Amino acid sequence: PHHLGSLGYRVGIAGKVHVKPASAFPFENINGFDPNCVRNPTQEHNLNGIRSFMQRDNKQPFCLIVALVEPHVPWVMGDSSKYPPSKLDLPPTIADTPRTRKDFSKYLAEITYMDGQVGEILNTLKKTGGEKDTLVLFTSEQGSQFPGNKWTNWNTGIHTALLARWPNHIT
């Protein structure tokens, strides 16, 4: 994204931005997504800022980074009742205790909440008419925040997601 501005792109970022100095990241800040990852509860998101950014100039390409804070401790977003702790199959890297089962339930609820946000963002892109000619990348920053996962060199700590969607280019 650093070099896209000089190539004629509008570059914007919404959500979690933990970079300094701001002058090294010449992105337009877009409101609507919580920049704080440990607020309880996380602020509800609002799509108006990204919708306005996407629609501003149909002739100029854009790069929009939406840095979602979910899933992140304290895992307060979403409906954890959909994931009863006693019925969960825990990954083998997570200790099976009542506390980890309860926490994993909240973690899954936040992932579901985040998935809903991604769907709303994609729907906003579709409504603005940019769905067919926009490369969408989805990635995560680290493994889950369970003991032995984040902050380790094991696969559960460093494995991240990367999904790409670009109609008629990537299948």
Q: Residues of each region from the PLM?
A:
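Formylglycine-dependent sulfatase
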Residues: 1-171
